[in-house]
């Protein structure tokens, strides 16, 4: 980092060195290997020992630094969305929402002008499995976008599917525990998964999507994205509307059947990462159009669902998709760890003109996402280049592990690390438009929403599938439920039947056929591989 970049950030890091620093010791080149202390390394092949066969010495600093850092290279992986791939790009606004001026609904600056460009970083991911798990597994896909706007960062953190399993974040730890491998075997268990779903009828819609071909996108380039939750837009008058965000790939949408996924996994379990990386390297830059759905703020009793329910889709015929811009990904990360893995997203990261709704899942995510970044990356994760906004930053937040700089402006009195102050320090920004002030009234309760309707849209989705998609859905669910506890089977069949009678009947028959097939097979444990010869 150059002196110029370090102006006003405190003497502790002014003039800090790095790989691109031109200052070298006598005899060094710009390519000379050094320790982290800047000492030239003259022998990186042999440890310092007493004679060529003797013991190593404790004062072998080069060895100790190298090995101790290696021991600490890994940070805790994300509890969800651990396997991911990232890319840089740009978002171009249209200045409109559909055919209307976007300013009618939001004052967010990144949307206001036709052709206005905002740099972005995107991270795609699987959800339930580990860092190096196959990308062909049946699992929702994460679709997180960090917009580096002139007003600071905006994170739009969503999934490929437009809905979620649950509508209250209180259930989120239990959901994820059920999806993760069993704590006794370290093997993912369909019985555990559906045991949770059997007590969560609101998950029926998401299950219907996940166990269809939409549960395995062919690759990230051919995948939709969605904000999932309900947000708000706020205009210059402080008026708010409810919004849903949708990403539509210009490349089209492609999914895998289970058989196709098995074939891909047999040859390449990094296929989605490789596909995105290679496409960008050859200049075939993937693009997504951003659409929003808009609804007046309110409870909307005329609908058979609550607009704040993230297990529901807003019907397009009532709430049409309106185009607001396009995103192009055009640059791969230089270092996966520094960028893709240390990238930290949060649903609470909004700019002026964008706001929260009372969506329970959104409010829970807003706490959890930023909290897990502080645990995973550290309290100063926002000072990392991939997470830092591309604009002025001045705070009174100080110290903490791995503090890289002090967030002071040039010329600030270093004694003043508080506000208000007459001496120095950052001052509050003037408000340029009225704040959105929705009125909320009611008793504090623990209660589900009044229009849960857990099966209506699941049935509509089942009937809307193409024949081959329905066949795939039934086959996948039958295979997953065959052999699990009959109480769980019965409850899930009750849900599928409530969604659509044909849906429930076909899954029931599929389970029976699968269990009959399993019963007819020998129950011997499989023996893998070919017997080996003796080694020399």
From Swiss-Prot:
Its EC number is 1.11.1.6. The keyword rRNA-binding does not apply. Its cofactor is heme. The keyword Cytoplasm applies. This is Catalase. PANTHER family: CATALASE, CATALASE-2. It is found in: Cytoplasm. Keywords: Cytoplasm, Heme, Hydrogen peroxide, Iron, Metal-binding, Oxidoreductase, Peroxidase. Belongs to the catalase family. Decomposes hydrogen peroxide into water and oxygen; serves to protect cells from the toxic effects of hydrogen peroxide. GO terms for biological process: hydrogen peroxide catabolic process; response to hydrogen peroxide. Residues 29-50 have a biased composition (Polar residues). It catalyses: 2 H2O2 = O2 + 2 H2O. CDD domains: catalase_clade_1. Residues 1-54, 419-439, 515-536 are annotated as: Disordered. It comes from Deinococcus radiodurans (strain ATCC 13939 / DSM 20539 / JCM 16871 / CCUG 27074 / LMG 4051 / NBRC 15346 / NCIMB 9279 / VKM B-1422 / R1). Residues 428-439 have a biased composition (Basic and acidic residues). Optimum temperature is 30 degrees Celsius. Active over a temperature range from 20 to 70 degrees Celsius. Retains 100% of its initial activity following incubation at 40 degrees Celsius, and 82% of its activity following incubation at 50 degrees Celsius. The activity decreases significantly to 30% of the initial activity following incubation at 60 degrees Celsius. GO terms for molecular function: catalase activity; heme binding; metal ion binding. GO terms for cellular component: cytoplasm.
